[in-house]
Amino acid sequence: RGKTQDSYNAGYFIFNGDGEMTGIPYLHDYGRGSGPIGLTNTNSVGVVRDAIGEWQFKKFGSGNPIDFSFGLPTVAETWDGFLNDINGYHVKKGDVFEAIDGAVSGSLAEGNVGGGTGMMCYYFKGGTGTSSRTVEVGGKKYTVGVLVQANFGILRDLVIAGVPVGKEITDLEPVEKPQQDGSIIVVVGTDAPLSPSQLNLVAKRATLGI
């Protein structure tokens, strides 16, 4: 959640797949983002985008008839229809407002929260995960933080602490043919003074982490 309406440098990279993500044309042409970034399920992209825009307008709107406080919100999705009644369209604007207004600095809630609530990972319960590092460049320290919404993976590929545990628990394999596809969203944030083109490269490097 931004403390001001100021936009920020931004980039993106699509590694594979056909997931929906709003705001890409603006990121591509201008290399700028504005307002909160939303992560949700496939069927809730529209309501989350509209709610973020409404939140920005109410918080930063000037009252001018030509007011662009709405911005062009960035919202991405993964499909959670296996665990969630996705066609019930249960995510409402109020849920988005609550999430934005409840955002705080410091440690983040992980696992079964937010957009990650209905997600799967390596046939187990997936969700939201984070990681961060501080780096020093030219005598100055910067933070690089990563948040993922994980919804992918097949059991036999599950590795924990270097141990291929997925190959040892094959009795948990489903009876039906295993689903081969999946999805993941990676959001990287930093206070380092990077340009949009550099941030595109940062986004591309996130695929190595996957």
Describe these PLM feature segments.
Residues 1-210:
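Alpha/propeptide regions of enzymes that mature by internal proteolysis
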